[in-house]
Each structure stands twice: as structure tokens, then as C-alpha cells.
Amino acid sequence: MLQQKITEIILYEPRPLFRNAAKNSIQAVNGSLLVTEPDALIEEVPPFNDQTSLFAAGVSGAGEEIYSLLRIIHHLIMQGKEIIVWVAKRDDLLIRLMYELGVQTLLCENYLEEELAQRMLSKNFSSGYLPLRSPLINNMNRKNRLTHSELNILIDCARGLSAYEIASLRHMGYKTVFTHKQNIRLRLSLQKSASWLDLLNRLDQIYSI
């Protein structure tokens, strides 16, 4: 039972409707859990260092903090932390990105209250409304996840920077930037240019909310 180990939930969900649904779901399962809601995300200070805390976040409503949120998710996963993330049912590209970052528990926000309650009761719960990990991303060991550099370049691309601008910003060669972009597309199975642009556009849409 998850609530026997976790004493605090760090909840990041800017949208009131989904935030209230998440809080209701958590407290219905275990009313003694402390639910902390950060006003803002600070990349330099991860949401928690305590093993008894769990980070839970809605990605689709992150707005201008989407890129900070992606970096925090990546950082926490690389630290071996378990986190819970929810996305919209049909947001296939965002689902792929979450799996590639290494998110183990991905829930469907359309059924958040139902699924989060089940996840709080069972660590092994998986959404019945989202594609499974394996058909989308194979070989999900740590070596095959997005690296820190690749995530930075993905974010730079979503912000509209050219490869030359990224090379200057990140102090690397143009060919290195190109190689990173190719690796990202391969990891996410986005061989078609249109699919790659769709992902960048989706991240920009979230940022512009």
C-alpha cells in the first residue's frame, strides 16, 4: 500500500479543476497525507529530497512552467524518484515524451480522480486509457532515455531556436546539435519531419496557455 510509505504529496497542477480532483482523490484514499502545492517550480531546487514524499503533476496545464517541469521530471527520475504524471487521453506525442523521460506512472487526466485513487492504493497500477509503454518506446533502460543535453535541445527547438542559435547557446558544434536532434527523433519514433514539428508545436501550445 503506497500510503504506508508516503507521508507527503508534492502536487503541481495549475488548473483548478484538475488540482481539486487530484486533492480529492488523494485525501479520499488517505486523509492523513500532507498535500503541498508549490506556487512555482524552481529548477535549481527539486520539489523534494525526502524519500517519503511523492511528486505528482499535470503536464498539459503547466503553461509557462512546462520546460521547468520537464527538467524537474527528468532530474527526479534520474535520481531514482518515483513520480506520478497525468496527460490527456489523446495526447500521443506528449505520452511518448513522458515515457521516454522514464515516467513509470502515467495517468489519463480525463479520468484523474478514478485513476489517481487506484494508483495511491497500488504502486503497480497502470492506466487503462493510455497506450502501454512497450508499443511506443522499446528498451526503456536508463541508457536509452533522453539525456540532459537532449532535453535541453528539445526545449530550445520548441522555443523556436535554430540549430546555429542552439550551438551558440549550448557551446557546442552545429553537427553535435544536429546529432542530438536526430537521436531525440529516433528515441521518440518521430522519423517524419511533420511529427517532429507536431511535438514542438504541442510544447509551445502548452507554454502559451
Model-derived segments and spans:
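Helix-turn-helix DNA-binding segment
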Residues: 136-176
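Generic structural marker for isolated residues within well-ordered, non-membrane alpha-helices
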Residues: 23, 163, 181
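DNA-binding alpha-helical recognition surfaces that contact promoter or target DNA
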Residues: 24, 155, 168, 179, ...
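Residues at alpha-helix boundaries and the short loops/turns that link adjacent helices
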Residues: 110, 160, 187-191
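N-terminal regulatory/sensing modules of transcriptional regulators
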Residues: 1-133
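Residues within the DNA-recognition helix of helix-turn-helix
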Residues: 119, 180-183
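Basic, Lys/Arg-enriched C-terminal extension of HTH/homeodomain DNA-binding domains
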Residues: 185-209
